[in-house]
């Protein structure tokens, strides 16, 4: 493993009353599970100027300077740099080795759901046991909250800039459109994690809604309803779509910058969550255009390259800027120095059909765990991060059409994906609507394993987490398990070992254990949240 260095790690509260600063310039060894030193809490003024000055306009090509440029002001010529700073925060900000950027939250969300078995190692064991983000005092709870609101505030700064005359350039409009898309992305995350699904109760209170940059005089807000938040998300995305019209990303390394395909993908996710089936299917199919599906299992093995033809949106990594790559140490089951935390439920493998190219990814390994060799860190210890790809869009279109009752149309995008994975068309003969929807949802689980959709799909579909322990007969079997020195050793299989909530009760739909909590330091600072 490598030593990583966290730069400018400042917590930014959604409440202007609370500003905490910790971990700046903390160099640590990654051979232990110790938390990065946090330093003292302090009030920050003009925090977006302080943070954003560290991000150069050639972000993701060269390592950002550690210098703080207090002269970076919110003017049109700085809009792109401000967006880049927001993006850098979203994916590179970290508080511990297991909390580095948005990819850590994606790991958390899958560990809380059905199909990942936690190998008891450093990382996400507490997530598997529903024992971190549900607790207001937990460090990961704090990390998740501030990661989103700091990014939102930085986006608000870029969005608030006014330009006229010669300052109103295409580059400025594109930067604002990208900031709007990322703000919508952040609020979509918050809406899915801090309240039950929109289709359960759109009037339920969720989180504060800030659309202007905060300052020490900003009045803390209370919770907005889900309907208010989703209305803002859709408005932001429609504005972004207009501003990004005609924008073309120059190369794959620029895939972190939203274009209209990304915006359509975010609209598809949003419409799916709000039950707008026609709009969801239309936006999803539009987003998928031009992103060719993989047809070879080798393209899955690694899943670390932003040039993958399926990837619509991703976060590239380089040797000089790669803190986010540390998340691969939890997902990679082959790398000898990895934690190998994410293993597959053996029952999950049983849902795959012979001929499916994804079956090649499974391998019994380690102490009897079933590895799923989807994610590999590269030899230079980096790995690009996928955020959105065309396979997800085909699944959104299929599910939306099926929920509308158009089963014949629904299986068309489903079969497009199945055929690419080596499978025949889904047989619709005699199938009822519920059966088709269930098959599409199962295909989502097979296709998107490890990509951060686990617990949000549980919440969206209002079902319980399902974890089934191995039976006596299943556990008595022996398998030749691959060892990281290249040899094989016989072990009994390992499956789910945590199959109820921490209080001993059974998994149920719409449980508070599936939701993130607001940090207690936030509710203490902003009494409007109580």
Predicted regions, residues:
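Short, surface-exposed recognition loops and adjoining beta-strand edges that mediate ligand/DNA contacts
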Residues: 67-72, 97-118, 195-203, 207, ...
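Conserved, well-structured interaction surfaces
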Residues: 121-194, 224, 242-245, 380-385, ...
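Membrane-proximal, proline-rich intrinsically disordered regions
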Residues: 55-106, 352, 426, 430, ...
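Hydrophobic-face positions in mid-chain alpha helices that act as interaction patches
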Residues: 279-391, 423-424, 437-439, 447, ...
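Glycine-biased, low-complexity coil/linker segments
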Residues: 18-22, 34, 39
């Amino acid at each position: 493993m490598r030593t990583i260095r966290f730069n400018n790690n400042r917590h930014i509260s959604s409440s202007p009353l609370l500003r905490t600063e910790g971990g700046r310039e903390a160099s640590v060894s990654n051979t232990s599970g110790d938390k990065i030193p946090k330093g003292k809490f302090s009030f920050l003024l003009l925090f977006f100027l302080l943070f954003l000055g560290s991000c150069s306009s050639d972000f993701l090509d060269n390592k950002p300077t550690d210098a703080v440029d207090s002269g970076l002001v919110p003017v049109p010529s700085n809009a792109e740099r401000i967006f880049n700073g927001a993006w850098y925060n979203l994916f590179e900000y970290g508080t511990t080795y297991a909390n580095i950027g948005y990819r850590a939250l994606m790991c958390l969300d899958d560990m809380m759901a059905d199909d990942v078995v936690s190998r008891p190692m450093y990382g996400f064991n507490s997530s598997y046991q529903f024992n971190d983000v549900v607790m207001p005092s937990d460090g990961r709870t704090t990390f998740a909250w501030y990661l989103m609101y700091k990014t939102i505030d930085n986006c608000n700064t870029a969005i608030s800039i006014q330009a006229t005359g010669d300052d109103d350039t295409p580059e400025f409009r594109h930067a604002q459109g990208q900031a709007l898309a990322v703000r919508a992305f952040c609020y979509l995350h918050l809406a899915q994690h801090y309240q039950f699904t929109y289709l359960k109760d759109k009037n339920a209170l969720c989180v504060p809604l800030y659309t202007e940059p905060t300052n020490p005089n900003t009045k803390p807000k209370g919770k907005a309803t889900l309907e208010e938040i989703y209305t803002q998300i859709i408005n932001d995305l429609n504005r972004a779509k207009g501003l990004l019209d005609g924008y073309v990303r120059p190369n794959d390394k620029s895939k972190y910058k939203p274009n209209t395909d990304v915006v359509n993908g975010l609209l598809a996710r949003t419409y799916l969550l709000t039950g707008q089936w026609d709009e969801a299917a239309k936006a999803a199919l539009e987003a998928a255009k031009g992103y060719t599906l993989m047809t070879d299992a080798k393209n899955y093995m690694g899943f670390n390259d932003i040039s993958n033809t399926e990837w619509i949106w991703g976060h590239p990594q380089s040797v000089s800027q790669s803190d986010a790559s540390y998340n691969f140490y939890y997902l990679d089951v082959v790398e000898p120095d990895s934690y190998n935390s994410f293993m597959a439920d053996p029952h999950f493998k049983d849902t795959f059909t012979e001929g499916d190219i994804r079956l090649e990814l499974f391998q019994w390994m380690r102490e009897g765990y079933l590895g799923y060799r989807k994610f590999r860190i590269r030899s230079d210890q980096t790995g690009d991060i996928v955020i959105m790809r065309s396979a997800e869009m085909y699944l959104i279109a299929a599910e939306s059409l099926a929920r509308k009752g158009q089963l014949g149309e629904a299986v068309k995008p489903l079969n497009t994906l199945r055929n690419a994975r080596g499978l025949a068309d889904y047989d619709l003969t005699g199938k009822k609507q519920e059966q088709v929807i269930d098959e599409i949802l199962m295909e989502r689980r097979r296709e998107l394993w490890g990509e951060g959709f686990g617990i949000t799909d549980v919440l969206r579909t209002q079902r319980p987490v399902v974890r089934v322990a191995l039976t006596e007969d299943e556990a008595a079997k022996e398998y030749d398990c691959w060892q990281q020195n290249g040899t094989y050793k016989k072990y009994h299989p390992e499956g789910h070992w945590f199959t109820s909530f921490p209080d001993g009760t059974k998994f149920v739909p719409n449980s508070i254990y599936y939701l993130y909590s607001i940090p207690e330091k936030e509710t203490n600072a902003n009494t409007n949240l109580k």
